[in-house]
Amino acid sequence: MSPSKWLLTYERAVKKATKVKLAAPKYKHVEIILEATTEDPETLENVIQALCERLKEQSWTIVFKTLIVFHVMLKEGAPNTTIVALSQRPRILEVLKASSLLAQGKNIYNYSRFLSERAKQYGRLGVDYAQVGDAPKKKIREMKLENGLLRNVEGIQAQLRRLIKCQFVAEEIDNDIAITAFRLLVGDLLVLFKAVNIGVINVLEHYFEMGHHDAAQSLRIYKTFVNQTEDIINYLSTARSLEFVTKFPVPNIKHAPISLTASLEEYLNDPDFEENRKQYLQNKSGSPVEETAILNRKPTLRKKKSIPKKQNESSSTIQKENTVQQEASSSEEEAVKSLPETQRTTSRIETQEEEIKEEEMEGEEEEEEEEVPNYESENELEDKVGDLSLSLGVASSFVDEMLRERNNLSAEGTSASPSLDKKSESTNIVQPIPSHPNDSLNPFYNSSSPTYHPQPIPPQLQQVQLLSQMAGNQMANIQYTMNGMQQTGASPNTALNISQVNMYAQNNPVNPSTTNPFQNFLRQPSYQGMQFEQQQPTTIPLQPNIPVLNQQYPVMIPAMEDSRGPLPSPAHIMYPEGSPGFIQHSPNGFTHGHSASPVNIGQKLDVPERPMSTPYTASKNPFSTRELAEPTDLARNSISTESKNPFRS
């Protein structure tokens, strides 16, 4: 492609990127302009010249978008290309006619001054500290005082001074152009502030090495840093409040200490400034006074070297003691040789016995040392067993709470829950087992057990537990009785089977069946002062439900009269023996809370047969005001053929 065509594409991209439209420059046009930064300097110069022509327009949108394109070229273009070209003539970025722009005029002016200052400081320092990367920060961190440390820090502060003045008001950031410019400025602010932090720390490290003039300049730099830090914090707080608009996360910044101004001024204004500086340099580099002191410390080193001599002396004394012991032992042997043979043998025997005792003592000590680990292992085993039992106790308590909440049982009426390893320790009480094995709430219940063998129960314990269950578990779905297998009518030597359970078997009158839906409506009698006897169970084959009672049970039937006389009292009704009922006969004649006469078994009553045509004795008309006639009159009127019209005379 010829250069003319290249120029045409770049000029077209510049015009498209800086249109009058109130919108941010499209990246597809900016991308073409960024390609010019990788071309030869002439192409880049032509693009810059075309952008400068757009800065002379009267529309603030065109001018603002042109500055944004310049900023993007400095940030995302080829490094050290656009900044080099602008540093040669930095004033071309300044918008002189910004005051004539009614809208966004102040923001455009400050924005252009910042870009111009950035290009100017690059031409002065040779480093673009606003460029993203670690190279500029590394350079200022390792820079020394004689290499222009103070000058570089002042250049960074000059850029920050111009940037802080670009304070966009929140009401002015109401369009995409201002939002894009503000986002780019916040990014440069964070990069420059990081660079100035590193530079100020480096200045403070060399502060006490400087002369009076450099120290005064460093103090001015530090004061400027303190003031700019406060302004930067306010600027970033505004940016943090506009994160939802700019979509640029603002981090929490850390800066150098800003409370050293007084101490630095005190050091600078000290009349002994030069003496303090020389002393600091001597302490840092090392003075000849210290070298002579180090040479004079040789006797101390000799004293340390004389320590092995003491060790040699101690070793020589030990050798002397050994020689003395050897001489003493040799003298004893000579004395023993001079003794007669009998005394020699006795002395040898004594020495042998002493040696044997010493060996036994040493053996016992070794055994004790070997047994210590065994004791430790036993302690560890006990700890492990204790931990295991604790965990089992926690598990059993959890099961207790689960059963208590599910069955709504009281603490007195429930027994200890089964553990994982041990069975129930009770020998006189049979654990309650539901009539259906699948409905068991016990998680450790073995449903595969073939038989059930109840154990003998003392009558007092049986009745007390029955009463506690009646008081605490009236609405339970499972019959928690002490002799549940026999009360439900199943054989004690057969496995639990639904087909073998008699659902119509007789129950204990003291403990009404918990499956009775009307049991909550029955008033519970007072059991104080009464003695209960053990109930002997009876097994009855499966029979249909016959609503006939074969025991004493309160039946309240109101007295009624018929046309032929009063009806007989229910106390004289004779029920056949052996008929199955819902409540078992109690031998003590216990009544269930009513004052009516009980039903006596064995008494006969002649019940007259009533005709089916007996009229009803009460009128069902709610609007009838006429008094009811006697039953005899009703029967007579039902047979008569007279008219029943009430309006007929």
Swiss-Prot record:
GO BP, sorted A to Z: clathrin coat assembly; clathrin-dependent endocytosis; intracellular protein transport; vesicle budding from membrane
Keyword Membrane: no
Residues of the ENTH domain: 2-136
Record InterPro entries: ANTH_dom (IPR011417), ANTH_dom_sf (IPR014712), AP180-like (IPR045192), ENTH (IPR013809), ENTH_VHS (IPR008942)
GO molecular function: 1-phosphatidylinositol binding; cargo adaptor activity; clathrin heavy chain binding; phosphatidylinositol-4,5-bisphosphate binding; SNARE binding
Places the protein is found: Cytoplasm
Modification Phosphoserine occurs at: S285, S287, S417
Phosphothreonine PTM positions: T414
GO CC terms, sorted: actin cortical patch; clathrin-coated pit; clathrin-coated vesicle; cytosol
Pfam families associated with the record: ANTH
Start and end residues of each stretch annotated as Disordered: 280-382, 409-440, 590-649
Alphabetical keyword list: Cytoplasm, Phosphoprotein
Biased composition regions of type Basic residues, renumbered to the chain: 299-308
Biased composition (Acidic residues): 352-381
Compositional bias (Polar residues): 313-326, 340-349, 409-418, 614-624, 635-649
Signal peptide start and end residues: none
PANTHER family: CLATHRIN ASSEMBLY PROTEIN, PHOSPHATIDYLINOSITOL-BINDING CLATHRIN ASSEMBLY PROTEIN LAP
Name used for this protein in its record: ENTH domain-containing protein C19F8.03c
